[in-house]
Amino acid sequence: MAWIQIRLNSTNEKAEQMSDFLEEIGSVSVTFMDSQDTPIFEPLPGETRLWGNTDVIALFDAETDMAEIVRLLKEAKHLDSNTAYKIEQIEDKDWEREWMDNFHPMQFGKRLWICPSWRDVPDENAVNVMLDPGLAFGTGTHPTTALCLEWLDGLDLKDKSVIDFGCGSGILAIAALKLGAKSAVGIDIDPQAILASRNNAEQNGVADRLQLFLSDEKPSDLKADVVVANILAGPLKELYPIISQLVKPNGDLGLSGILETQAQSVCDAYTQTFALEPVAAREEWCRITGKLKTL
């Protein structure tokens, strides 16, 4: 089936109203894209943070009369002489196959591979985590996930307990278990993340060693030898009292989801309690690691 796409330049104030209207007049999907390569940092809970200049992209059936769509947009004052727009035909493709073709096995550190289930495992003797993009973020493609996976690969996790704080897909907890950890706990605020982590753990044969909790249901006395939190700088600082209490004496802490420009403020929050190591950076993101200080 072929499609017609209209791309309209808008602002963050008008983009969502334009999106609603496009759906009302027959668009089968609407997406937002950045017009000027402007980064977006941490949104508040429940907030849809958009760029100052936002492109609204709507997809219509190929039989749609786009002249009528443009007329309706003008009539509703979503389109005027100052609004740039472009209409183009979209080639019909096997989108599912193209999406799958974009994911390949990825290596992290010396031993660890993350592999989509539809790909052959590159090294049968490696530590292979089978993980498909799906219910929650975290497949190894983002620099922060990669930094955390490489850190875990470099640790001696044999017989260790691990907490994945903000577990998402469960990728870090599952990788830790397959790297030798005795047990792991995944914590998240999102029930979808708990579901995704459970499904991924079952796929990798480690579900019996992974406990999962919503953040407000975790045991009050929970502690582990290794704690990793790949969330965002703001929450990492705000949750310092909680995260630091999860680490056993002489235990290891790994933090990511942090921009390089935010690293110092996160280090400042944790430095009294942890002996921090040099910050590791990749593509403007970084990882902070350290050991809990002993009195």
Swiss-Prot record:
Catalytic activity: L-lysyl-[protein] + 3 S-adenosyl-L-methionine = N(6),N(6),N(6)-trimethyl-L-lysyl-[protein] + 3 S-adenosyl-L-homocysteine + 3 H(+)
Main location: cytoplasm
Domain of life from the UniProt record: Bacteria
EC class: transferase
One annotated GO molecular function: protein-lysine N-methyltransferase activity
Keyword terms of this UniProt record: Cytoplasm, Methyltransferase, S-adenosyl-L-methionine, Transferase
Localization annotation: Cytoplasm
GO biological process: methylation
EC annotation from Swiss-Prot or TrEMBL: 2.1.1.-
Annotated Gene Ontology cellular component terms: cytosol
Similarity section: Belongs to the methyltransferase superfamily. PrmA family.
Descriptive protein name: Ribosomal protein L11 methyltransferase
Organism from which the protein derives: Haemophilus influenzae (strain PittEE)
